């Protein structure tokens, strides 16, 4: 059959028919897609926390968080609720939260029935559920808490505890510990305070004896030797000299022994120990035994030992962090806080914590001097290897005021290794206390403390730059300006004999 061209009108009709068929096919596909999307929407809406029938908060009770993120199905409700008092974040069924009992005394202070374990979250905070279904939110920073828990678990020591606190309001930002024999080691008040007590002695010496950081104290014997032979000041035999600031940084026992027996007395030292929180409760929400300090008054030798950190002084890691926070907070010791707020099931805030001060431990100027003296610990003293790389600070523009302590204890048994610190010195934002017992080098308290500072301030440690020999010689000479041994008469005679022997040879 020969091909023949259709008339124009017929051809146009066929083209329109084909176009209509294509449009009908597209509309059918679009309708199918719309059905799928609509079904998915309703399926997701049914599973949403706001519409979950198992959720204790229904879709009719949208709840806001502190950052105004609202859990509601209606956008108009989100606009209406924006800016209201924060209560809850994302809501989960109650079985996902551990429970804890909270009571209140006559003054309104809250008390937890036990020391909380941070193992359950609600939104972006750690939380527990009370017996009457109220939510208890804690002050800990989840990121810092997870990091601290990690380094505590990895630490090679028989007992470890780390406490990080905001010195300005007393909020505990991280707290973790591990021990095979001591329950809740972070709150255990049986650790010897060791040289941490030198901070108390230094505070008393500054305010009661007029001692300054640059004051020079003479002594004899080794830097860490304090016994019945050298505890009494003797100008005729004391041939070594050291400033009080460097003595605190290097933890020089004879210098602080002299401060206790020569410039202070037992009653003054006991009063300052009580100001720093010893022999009294810190009024924490969780059960916390008080730290104990026994200060001798009649025995000068025992008074010297106590002033240097060898006495009967016991302290808990959380109390050590509170002392550090008190010095960093201008002399006002904040009350440590674990509870941030308590929220009812309907989203209303029942309790909101606010900063509280236990008492003033030292004057603001004294606190400033103590921070300056404690900086010697991290620059030239016992923590120098952790916080300095050659002549460069490890933490860069975040200078750290610190203090170490090392002493063998009995509860628990072992060599106790302490570090407390606050940074930055000009405006402290974090106070840290670390205790390790029988640690390996990589798990010493100063090392763990440095890691906590690096994590909190998001600092990358500086690379080590070797110091040239000329700089090393000059730095060693500068150190002798702070601590040197005076020549004895025997050394003078020996040098005189060498001089005349050389003269005879000539």
Regions from the PLM with identified roles:
Residues 41-161, 169, 352, 356, ...:
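Extracytoplasmic/periplasmic proteins that interact with beta-lactams or build/remodel peptidoglycan
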Residues 349-350, 354, 446-493, 497, ...:
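Short, gly/Ser/Thr-rich active-site loops of penicillin-recognizing serine hydrolases
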Residues 194-203:
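Active/ligand-binding-proximal structured segments within catalytic/core domains
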Residues 504-506:
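Short, solvent-exposed mixed-charge patches
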